[in-house]
Curated annotation (Swiss-Prot):
Modified residues (Tyrosine amide): 8
Top-level taxonomic group: Eukaryota
Organism: Delia radicum
UniProt record, GO biological process: neuropeptide signaling pathway
Name of the protein: Neuropeptide Y-amide
Tissues and organs where the protein is expressed, per its UniProt entry: Expressed in the CNS and the ring gland but not in midgut, thoracic perisympathetic organs (tPSO) or abdominal perisympathetic organs (aPSO) (at protein level).
Taxonomic classification: Eukaryota, Metazoa, Ecdysozoa, Arthropoda, Hexapoda
Keywords: Amidation, Neuropeptide
């Protein structure tokens, strides 16, 4: 699960 500020 991506954290805030991480986009994949």
């Amino acid at each position: 699960l991506p954290s805030i500020g991480h986009y994949y």
